[in-house]
């Protein structure tokens, strides 16, 4: 019985922490003068807490595993909602594809530039350099 209660406690703690970050993000988003989704702010809060090791990762792991396992199921309502606008999407197919391609290219460029900025140029092991 004790093992069962321990497992229940681990899942309960994980979901309470995840939802606490979510609702903190929603609250902060309601105070901001700009429109930023509360779920994004909540995710950033959770990421900061995990990165600074204020919140141990083992506390949220059980809840994360459950959410990842059933992630495909969580996208079904979104897919059904998109199908309501199928005619509009078909009429605007070209601009949608172009905007997706351009935004993907912009993301690639920004990530590569910021990675280069953070990590700098590194010498490959075994590569001959100018230091001779």
Swiss-Prot record:
Its family?
Belongs to the UPF0299 family.
Record NCBIfam families: PRK01821.1
| Gene (name only) | yohJ
Principal localization?
membrane
Q: Where in the cell is it found?
A: Cell inner membrane
The cellular component terms of Gene Ontology attached to this UniProt record, alphabetical and capped at eight, are: plasma membrane
Entry keyword set: Cell inner membrane, Cell membrane, Membrane, Transmembrane, Transmembrane helix
Kindly provide the name given to this protein in its UniProt entry.
Answer: UPF0299 membrane protein YohJ
How is this protein positioned relative to the membrane? Multi-pass membrane protein
Report the transmembrane regions from the record.
5-25, 26-46, 63-83, 93-113
What InterPro entries does this protein's entry cite?
LrgA/CidA, Uncharacterised_UPF0299
């Amino acid at each position: 019985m004790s093992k069962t209660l321990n497992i229940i406690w681990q899942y309960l703690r994980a979901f309470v922490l995840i939802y606490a970050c979510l609702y903190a993000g929603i609250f902060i988003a309601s105070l901001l003068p700009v429109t930023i989704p509360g779920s994004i702010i909540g995710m950033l809060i959770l990421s900061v807490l995990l990165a600074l090791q204020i919140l141990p990762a083992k506390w949220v792991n059980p809840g994360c595993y459950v959410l990842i396992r059933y992630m495909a199921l969580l996208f079904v309502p979104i897919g059904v909602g998109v199908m309501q606008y199928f005619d509009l999407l078909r009429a605007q197919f070209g601009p949608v594809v172009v905007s997706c391609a351009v935004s993907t290219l912009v993301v690639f460029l920004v990530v590569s530039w910021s990675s280069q900025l953070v990590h700098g140029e590194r010498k490959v092991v075994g590569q001959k350099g100018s230091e001779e």
